[in-house]
């Protein structure tokens, strides 16, 4: 491992500022925790893994420029990072041209493959499908969609609309607000939600707008019965910004919640409490960044090399005992087998798991299986919730 190209170095592409800074900060520290653990084990080939960080500020162009700087000027071949889909898409051609590797620890809309990206967050069959079944069964068939105005919410809503129609559900409204919404943007959206009289609200709003939206909906409904807000992305980081009565009763689907009472989860939470700063929250996407970085290091240790081609050869053979449970990457599509859990938030802001898949779900990023009943058969033999 004497060459510059083989220096154990990871570039972290997580924003410290911007609309998704809270969640990306949690991801950054999840990745750093894994690096600390790997270095306690001796690093790679006896050399410690080093990290470089930049703050792209949530701007896709800056993600691209940061990735180019890491690769061209700093000798980085492995990146961990990106949250919003348009930031991943900005980085994709950079890593493909350089034959570098990006580990992407975030849920996304599916319908994508790159040999230079390892997808560590859920695809639609691992989150949207079980959530749609759960909402229809437990809350009703009438739904309003609201999302931030970029790729991921629009594509996720396309999939969710299809799933609702399969079950005889009705999408009453599909509303989008800017990534940096004004008070008026939020109020207009909430009034449309209120007038629709939906059974449930499906939100793909991300970042700072999440708490603003949830708070505005609670105000508009007052003491009346308000529909639950269900989300693929709302995490402990966003809930920490809400009052307890605003968060209570909301529904989230994710592979992991910090409230899971297993030995692996308890150990992870304890490690995070000893490592994370006060402004970083333990989230599902911190867990994804943690296990993806751990997998990267384990593959390099197995290869005895920090070369991309050597690491990739071992990447698919390793199963990580992650805090969520066992995870592994599928060779044919670079997506990950993940657990799926649906939780409702209680009065203390704790995510109480109401359903979980009996075993990790194989990814179906291209939605090859179109029917919810067929998806149920692919979920480790477990029925949809």
UniProtKB/Swiss-Prot annotation:
Keyword Kinase: yes
A Pfam family that the UniProt record links to this protein: Peripla_BP_5
Signal peptide: none
GO biological process terms on file: amino acid transport; regulation of amide catabolic process
InterPro entries for this protein: AmiC_PBP1 (IPR039570), Leu_Ile_Val-bd (IPR000709), Peripla_BP_I (IPR028082)
Source organism, top-level taxon: Bacteria
Keywords per UniProt: Kinase, Repressor, Transferase
Result, substituting residue 106 to N: In strain: PAC181; butyramide inducible phenotype
Database matches in Gene3D superfamilies: 3.40.50.2300
Gene Ontology MF terms in the entry: amide binding; kinase activity
Keyword set includes Repressor: yes
Protein function: Negatively regulates the expression of the aliphatic amidase operon. AmiC functions by inhibiting the action of AmiR at the protein level. It exhibits protein kinase activity.
Subunit record text: Homodimer. Forms a complex with AmiR.
Record remark: domains: Consists of two beta-alpha-beta domains with a central cleft in which the amide binds.
Name of the protein described by the UniProt record: Aliphatic amidase expression-regulating protein
UniProt source species: Pseudomonas aeruginosa (strain ATCC 15692 / DSM 22644 / CIP 104116 / JCM 14847 / LMG 12228 / 1C / PRS 101 / PAO1)
């Amino acid at each position: 491992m004497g060459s510059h190209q083989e220096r154990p170095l990871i570039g972290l592409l997580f924003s410290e500022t911007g609309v998704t800074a809270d969640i990306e900060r949690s991801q950054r520290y999840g990745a750093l925790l894994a690096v600390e653990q790997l270095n306690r084990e001796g690093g790679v080939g006896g050399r410690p893994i080093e990290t470089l960080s930049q703050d792209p500020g949530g701007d896709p162009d800056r993600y691209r420029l940061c990735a180019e700087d890491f690769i061209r000027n700093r000798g980085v071949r492995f990146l961990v990072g990106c949250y919003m889909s348009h930031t991943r898409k900005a980085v994709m051609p950079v890593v493909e041209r350089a034959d570098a590797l990006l580990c992407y620890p975030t849920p996304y809309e599916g319908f994508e493959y790159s040999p230079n990206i390892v997808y560590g967050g859920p695809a639609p069959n691992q989150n949207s499908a079980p959530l749609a079944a759960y909402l229809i069964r437990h809350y009703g068939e009438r739904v309003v969609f609201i999302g931030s105005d970029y790729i991921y919410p629009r594509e996720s809503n396309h999939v969710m609309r299809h799933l609702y129609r399969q079950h005889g559900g009705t999408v009453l409204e599909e509303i989008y607000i800017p990534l940096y919404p004004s008070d008026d943007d939020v109020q207009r959206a909430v009034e449309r939600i209120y007038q629709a009289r939906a059974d449930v609200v499906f939100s793909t709003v991300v970042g700072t707008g999440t708490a603003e939206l949830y708070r505005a909906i609670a105000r508009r409904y007052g003491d009346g019965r308000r529909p639950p807000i269900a989300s693929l992305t709302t995490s402990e980081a966003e809930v920490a910004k809400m009052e307890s009565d605003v968060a209570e009763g909301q529904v989230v689907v994710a592979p992991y919640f910090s409230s899971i009472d297993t030995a692996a989860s308890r150990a992870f939470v304890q490690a995070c409490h000893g490592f994370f700063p006060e402004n970083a929250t333990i989230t599902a996407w911190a867990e994804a960044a943690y296990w993806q970085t751990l997998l990267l290091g384990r593959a390099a240790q197995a290869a005895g090399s920090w070369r991309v081609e050597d690491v990739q050869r071992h990447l698919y053979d390793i199963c990580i005992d992650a805090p969520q449970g066992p995870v592994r990457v599928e060779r044919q599509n670079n997506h990950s087998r993940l657990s799926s859990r649906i939780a409702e938030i209680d009065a203390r802001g704790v995510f109480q798991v109401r359903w979980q898949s009996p075993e990790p779900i194989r990814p179906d990023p291209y939605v090859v299986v179109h029917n919810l009943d067929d998806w149920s058969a692919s979920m480790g033999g477990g029925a949809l919730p």
